């Protein structure tokens, strides 16, 4: 099974190298990392003087203008650049806690689950409100959600986060993927379609 990681970028900093290193040392290997970079000049400044493509041989970089960027459309473009069986959507500030991120995300997709998102842990410098929000939205215990949860969870039934989420490609294609044009919540819109489809 091939697994690709797709990451939209905007003015990436040096933490991108740490993220790529962590993705390169996962217990379940990543086939390809697809970077969808907005505004080429910032990326070029970041990698100036280093052998980026030699160091990160499984990384492909595609540049998108700021005018063209759209949360749904840009991610759709990234999926089209991938041929993997499953793919992970991440943001540039998401950082794997350990080398088992991909392993843990792919486990539920072995059954009937079509998308799994990672738990976000609060940063050490988080405010109490930020910490509480992370704990509420990303509890320690995993849960499979379906239409049966609508009465108890309401709109939270559709919660999914492309900060770090793995998708089954076959189901993604069957449902038509992410909406073409959206400023935000492409992940929850997709999850809503998924829950409604059963």
Regions found by a protein language model. Name each.
Residues 12-25:
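Short, well-formed alpha-helical segments that are part of the catalytic scaffolds
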Residues 22-63:
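Acidic donor-binding segment of Leloir-type glycosyltransferases
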Residues 65-82:
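Glycine-rich, basic loop-to-helix element that forms the pyrophosphate-binding segment
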Residues 83-84, 161-175:
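Conserved nucleotide-sugar donor-binding
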Residues 87:
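Short aromatic/hydrophobic "clamp" motif used to bind/position activated sugar donors
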Residues 148-167, 183:
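A recurrent flexible, glycine/aromatic-enriched loop bordering the glycosyltransferase active site
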Residues 184-190:
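Acidic donor-binding loop at a coil-to-helix junction in glycosyltransferase catalytic cores
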């Amino acid at each position: 099974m091939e697994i690709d990681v797709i990451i939209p970028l905007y003015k990436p900093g040096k933490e991108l190298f740490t993220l790529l290193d962590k993705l390169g040392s996962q217990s379940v290997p990543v086939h390809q990392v697809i970077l969808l970079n907005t505004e080429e000049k910032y990326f070029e400044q970041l990698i100036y003087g280093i052998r980026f493509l030699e160091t990160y041989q499984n990384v492909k970089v595609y540049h998108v203008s700021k005018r063209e960027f759209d949360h749904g459309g840009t991610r759709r473009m990234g999926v089209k650049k991938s041929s993997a069986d499953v793919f992970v959507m991440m943001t540039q500030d998401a950082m794997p806690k350990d080398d088992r991120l991909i392993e843990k995300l792919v486990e539920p997709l072995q059954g009937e689950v079509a998308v799994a998102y990672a738990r976000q842990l609060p940063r050490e410098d988080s405010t109490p409100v930020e910490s509480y929000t992370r704990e509420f939205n990303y509890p320690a215990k995993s849960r499979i959600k379906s239409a049966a949860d609508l009465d108890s969870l309401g709109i939270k039934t559709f919660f999914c986060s492309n900060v770090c989420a793995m998708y089954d490609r076959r189901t993604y294609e069957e449902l038509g993927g992410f909406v073409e044009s959206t400023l935000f919540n492409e992940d929850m819109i997709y999850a809503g379609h998924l829950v409604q489809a059963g």
